Amino acid sequence: MNITDVRIRKISAEGKMKAIVSVTFENQFVVHDIKVIEGQNGLFIAMPSRKTPDGEFKDIAHPINTETREQIQKAILDEYEKVKNLDVQE
């Protein structure tokens, strides 16, 4: 499944969450609310999730193999690096 669009919807210079992203696949399916997070080993993505009644977070949508996760993460982080200095909202 090809990634046809990556939209960085919100960028923040403060805190560990750096951006909120939407990714479109094959111009047919979009996943909103993917987060770009700054961790101890650099930036990574967190798929959209919701909090369960017992306080645990569960992904709403996520890739089912490593290759797809890496493809999505690379596309998002490449786009984030392009736009992060253009539109910083504090």
Curated annotation (Swiss-Prot):
Family under the similarity heading: Belongs to the SpoVG family.
Annotated PANTHER family: SEPTATION PROTEIN SPOVG-RELATED (PTHR38429:SF1)
Pfam families, per the entry: SpoVG
Gene Ontology biological-process entries: division septum assembly; sporulation resulting in formation of a cellular spore
InterPro entries in UniProt: SpoVG (IPR007170), SpoVG_sf (IPR036751)
Its biological purpose: Could be involved in septation.
Protein name: Putative septation protein SpoVG
Record keywords, A-Z: Cell cycle, Cell division, Septation
